[in-house]
Each structure stands twice: as structure tokens, then as C-alpha cells.
């Protein structure tokens, strides 16, 4: 039996109401902060999916996106490093298609069937942009999902998968484009989305001897709410009872991540014995039949979709949204000098910077970050072991507010964090409202982008107010 053994999702804490984008807009969508991108969100989703698991058991990491920060540099290897996976594993980018996440899941199942791997982490993430004033601007949102695929302790069995392709230009973005493009919406939806989904779903269900009444929940990628309801009704589903809410009104369309996020949302409400039809779309379809097992009970309470949707803040205004997305540029502040990164130093300190390793004294147990050669408590020398701090929570010991350093993050909150496991680190706080910051508040770690210069994205860990109690 091969299937899903764990899952995790990440939806940015920030939302923007569509009314703020254009008068009359309904609902809201998720927005990545200025220091987030598809890679940082993939790390967060992956960390959530690995909670309680032995990370050395992961044999491969597949990262799917249409908005990778790097075009020539493997993004999956950076995610694997940040998530703290062992180095002798297969890492792969699955790029340039909205069904990259489901394609990666199919590849993972085939690798496991072939005996090339036992446990594979699949993560999908996107930060797509629609041009200002367009319908796509209202729909496109940010988020990430992650699934662990394996053959032991399976919570959701993957019974069957089929794939089709449909060669037509409907949604696209060329190499030099910042915004995704589309054209005649009626033609695109009828000849592209609806026909492809109907064909893939009917072929798969017929091959498995299933009818619509045999499906507990249909999880169908949706470019918008109306088209999803239309295609679900044509397949024969009761839209209100059998179809997963596409979350367009509260989340938006998260692109490559959408099929994984919607599946995770469905699994959070599923019970053993449920059968799920899972369909993604992008120049064709991937469709799968999934069966929920008793193992789903072991995954209750994970950081998934519902907890992320309940934890939210609102972007101040549309101008701030445009600045975060790099569409508008604000003048550099007087206290923010040009920044550079030393590639040699980054390579040398990658475990400290990317994996966020501290050191623990073998003599007295004192934890230090950054790692040191001499223990500050017992003064023993060179007797340390590594400890991962990226998945540790902590409390805010003290902080300062800087109102001039960074125009995109006013004020910059420099924080001193005491980890619950021991040790202390000085970190920048993000995703905050300055008036809500208090000594002793709970914080958690988040992988973020510090700056971009000379084609290099410089990443490090920050702290954020805890989104869970």
C-alpha cells in the first residue's frame, strides 16, 4: 500500500480584502509578506508535515512551483537544507505547470513502487501575480502544501492515478513576464478546464468501476468557484454535499499549491473509509482515487489548512500590497545601506544560517546560538553537539523597535528569544503588529528572505508571533 503518511500546509498570516483592490470585490485572499516567496513557504509547509517524524527517514524531496526564486539553481536542494534533511537524497524541482504538485506525487508513488525510495516529501508552493486591475489579480494568492508519501503507516491510500494533457494556450507566463496572462475566458474555461477535468475524471472513475455516488468527497482544482461547481455538477456530484470548498472567497487560487491545500483541507474533515476523487488542472489533468484509512486519526491536530485560515492579519492597504509584491518601489531608507552576501561565508556557515543549528554542551547541556567553541556556563572547550532550533518555540525576552532601517518593515523589531528547549538567539521578528508585541509572548521560527542582490536571494531564520496556542 502506497499513499500519504503525513501532511502539512502553510498559508501566510496576511490577507487583503478584495474590496481594497477594487470596489465591489467580495471576500479576501492570502498574501505572502515582503520577506516570503515560494521557497520560504515550501519550507514552512514541509516543516509542518515533518512534525513528529524522523527526518533521516526521508529519501527524496520534490519541490513543485511555477514561481521558483531561481531559474538556474536547484531550489529543492535549498528547501532540503532548510528542512534539515540528510544530504544523500534525491532532490528535484518540478517546474512550469500548475499540476506540478500532483505530478510530483505521481512521480513519488512510482519511485516507491520501483524500490528507489521509501519515504518522499512532496511540497508545492506558489506566489503568482495577476496584473493590477485584472481578474487574475483578485484570484491569485499565496500558499504552500506538503505531503509525505510512503508505504508504511499510510493514512490515505493512493489507489489509482491517471494523467492527460491538453495542448492549448489558456494561462501562461513567458520568461520575461512578471504577470500571468490569459485570454477569452469563456473559451479557455469550456475547452480547457471543463473538458479536461471531465475527461480525466470520467476515464479514471470508469476504469475503477466507480460512479459519482461512490465518492465521499471530490477535491477539484478550481480557477474560480463557478467553474468548479459547473464541472462537479456535470460529473454527477452533489455540489453542496460531495465537493470540497475551493476556498476561493477566503484564500484565493494558490496555483501549484492549490490541489495539495484543498486535499489537506478535505483530509482534516475526513474519516476512515472515505473515498476521494482528486483532480488538478494545468494544460491537462492529473486525477487520482484516494481511500482514507484508520491511520488518518494519527494526523489529527497537525498544522494544516484550518489553523492557518483562522490565524490572520490584514494588509494595511493596497499600496502596501503592491510594495510587498515589488510592483511599486519605495525609496531606500536613510538607515538601510546596500547589502551584499559573501558566498564563501554562506557556504562555510550554511548549517548555522540555513539549517539553524545551535550547539549544546556535552558537559552541562547549555545551548548556544551561534555555535561556540567554549561553553559560557562550564567553560568546557570543543565538547558540543549540534541541535536544530528551526522547529523550536520560544518566548520573547526583550526587543527594540527601529523606525528608520527598512521602509518595507516599519518598525523593524529586533528580538531576543529564549528557546523553550534552552538557549537564546537575537532574531528579527516578522508578521507582527508593533502594538501587540509583549515581553514573554510565544514565538516560533520561520525561514525568510533577508534581501536580494546581484541575483542572489539571501535567506535566514526570523521569529514570528506564534499562530497556535
Language model: regions and residue ranges:
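Claisen-condensing/thiolase-fold acyl-transfer catalytic domains that form or cleave C-C bonds
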Residues: 39, 43, 67-68, 86-88, ...
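Phosphate/pyrophosphate-binding loops at sites that engage ATP/ADP/AMP, CoA/4′-phosphopantetheine
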Residues: 45-59, 198-216, 235
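Condensing-enzyme catalytic core mediating Claisen C-C bond formation in acyl metabolism
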Residues: 1-38, 133-191, 195, 271, ...
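OB-fold/S1-family single-stranded nucleic acid-binding modules
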Residues: 446-469
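Short nucleic-acid-contacting surface segments enriched for D/E, G, S/T with interspersed K/R
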Residues: 431-445
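Short, conserved beta-turn/loop elements at beta-strand boundaries and strand-helix junctions
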Residues: 399-405, 450
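Cys/His-rich short segments
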Residues: 335-393
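Short aromatic-glycine-enriched beta-strand elements
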Residues: 404-416, 457-460
Amino acid at each position: 500500500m502506497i499513499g500519504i503518511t503525513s501532511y502539512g500546509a502553510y498559508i501566510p498570516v496576511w490577507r487583503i480584502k478584495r474590496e481594497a483592490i477594487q470596489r465591489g470585490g467580495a471576500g479576501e485572499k492570502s498574501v505572502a509578506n515582503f520577506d516570503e516567496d515560494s521557497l520560504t513557504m515550501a519550507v514552512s509547509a514541509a516543516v509542518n508535515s515533518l512534525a513528529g517524524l524522523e527526518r533521516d527517514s526521508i529519501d527524496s524531496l520534490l519541490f513543485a512551483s511555477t514561481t521558483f526564486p531561481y531559474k538556474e539553481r536547484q531550489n529543492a536542494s535549498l528547501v532540503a537544507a532548510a528542512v534539515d534533511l540528510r544530504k544523500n537524497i534525491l532532490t528535484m524541482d518540478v517546474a512550469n505547470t500548475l499540476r506540478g504538485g500532483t505530478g510530483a506525487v505521481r512521480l513519488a508513488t512510482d519511485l516507491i513502487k520501483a524500490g528507489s525510495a521509501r519515504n518522499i516529501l512532496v511540497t508545492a508552493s506558489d506566489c503568482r501575480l495577476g496584473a493590477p486591475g485584472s481578474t487574475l489579480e483578485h484570484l491569485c494568492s499565496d500558499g504552500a502544501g506538503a505531503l509525505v508519501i510512503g508505504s508504511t503507516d499510510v493514512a490515505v491510500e493512493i489507489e489509482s492515478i491517471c494523467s492527460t494533457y491538453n495542448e492549448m494556450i489558456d494561462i501562461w507566463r513567458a520568461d520575461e513576464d512578471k504577470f500571468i496572462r490569459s485570454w477569452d475566458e469563456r473559451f479557455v474555461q469550456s475547452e480547457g478546464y471543463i473538458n479536461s477535468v471531465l475527461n480525466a475524471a470520467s476515464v479514471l472513475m470508469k476504469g475503477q468501476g466507480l460512479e459519482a455516488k461512490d465518492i465521499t468527497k471530490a477535491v477539484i482544482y478550481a480557477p474560480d468557484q463557478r467553474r468548479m461547481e459547473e464541472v462537479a455538477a456535470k460529473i454527477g456530484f452533489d455540489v453542496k454535499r460531495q465537493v470540497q470548498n475551493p476556498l476561493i472567497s477566503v484564500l484565493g487560487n494558490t496555483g501549484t499549491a492549490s490541489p495539495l491545500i484543498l486535499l489537506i483541507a478535505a483530509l482534516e474533515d475526513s474519516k476512515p473509509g472515505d473515498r476521494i476523487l482528486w483532480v488538478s488542472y494545468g494544460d491537462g489533468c492529473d486525477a487520482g482515487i484516494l481511500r482514507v484509512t484508520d491511520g488518518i486519526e494519527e494526523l489529527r491536530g497537525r498544522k494544516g489548512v484550518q489553523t492557518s485560515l483562522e490565524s490572520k492579519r490584514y494588509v494595511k492597504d493596497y499600496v502596501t500590497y503592491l510594495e510587498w509584491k515589488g510592483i511599486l518601489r519605495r525609496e531606500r531608507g536613510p538607515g538601510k545601506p546596500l547589502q551584499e552576501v559573501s558566498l564563501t561565508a554562506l557556504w562555510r556557515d550554511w548549517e548555522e544560517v540555513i539549517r539553524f543549528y545551535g550547539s549544546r554542551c556535552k558537559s552541562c547541556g547549555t545551548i548556544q546560538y551561534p555555535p561556540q567553541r567554549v561553553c559560557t556556563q562550564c567553560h568546557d572547550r570543543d565538547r558540543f553537539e549540534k541541535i536544530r532550533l528551526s522547529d523550536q518555540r520560544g518566548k520573547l525576552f526583550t526587543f527594540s523597535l527601529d523606525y528608520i532601517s527598512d521602509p518595507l518593515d516599519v518598525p523593524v523589531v529586533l528580538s531576543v528569544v529564549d528557546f523553550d528547549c534552552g538557549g537564546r538567539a537575537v532574531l528579527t521578528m516578522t508578521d507582527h503588529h508593533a502594538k501587540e508585541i509583549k515581553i514573554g509572548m510565544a514565538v516560533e521560527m520561520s525561514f525568510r528572505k533577508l534581501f536580494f542582490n546581484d541575483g542572489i536571494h539571501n535567506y535566514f531564520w526570523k521569529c514570528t508571533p506564534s499562530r497556535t496556542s
